[in-house]
Amino acid sequence: MNTSSLADLAPGLADPVHDAQQVFRRLLDAMSRPGRLQSLDDAAVRVDPPAGLGAATAAVLLTIADPDLRVWFAPGAHAEALAAWLRFHTGARIAGSAIEADWLVLSAQDARPDVWSEAAIGTDEAPHTAATLLVEVLSLSAAPGLQLTGPGIEHHHSLDVGGVGTAFWQERQSREHHFPRGADLVLTCGPLIAALPRSTRIALED
């Protein structure tokens, strides 16, 4: 990478240690309380994300990525630049295909039903080797849309996800019987994140 290319890269976290700790705690909270909105507060706001990524998506990637992590960006106009940005700041490896990746980074438009079959789902003996889908959506709110049940949810919880088609969720539903195999899902919008671990069951609300 030449000097001019380096100058074009967007910066990382403003305070790498403090901000990464904050983002990681919020991410753990999101995974342990499925569907509950978590705000990344200053950590996301202080990220100047590259073109093609929102603040929360960038903050999560800068927090979880390291040289052992394989990340796949959905093909698009910004994919190559995003890969260079993430490699520069974290040393993460860029996967050549979705099935090779530990984390798949998608826009709402990229969240098609076939993504579920392209992501690694782990094995019964090693479910932790499954992938995580990181999807940047158009809106997130605690409103009717998806009804969530399962571990970490008392009774049920509603989450409305903007920009993701019904077929994506129907395919996710059809794979729930594979548990403990299955991909986890992290949703972002602006500074907000919400998570749907593979243990969470979903139903479409009217």
Where do the language-model regions lie?
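N-terminal basic/disordered segments at the start of proteins
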Residues: 1-30
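A generic structural signal for ordered alpha-helices
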Residues: 1-9, 49, 60, 64, ...
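Flexible, glycine/proline-enriched loop segments at strand-loop-helix junctions
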Residues: 10-14, 70-72, 154-161
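Generic hydrophobic, helix-prone segments enriched in Leu/Val/Ile
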Residues: 27, 31, 64, 170-176
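A glycine-rich, hydrophobic loop/mini-helix early in the fold
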Residues: 30-96
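Internal, well-folded beta-alpha domain core
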Residues: 76, 80-195, 205-206
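Conserved, well-ordered active-site substructure
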Residues: 198-202
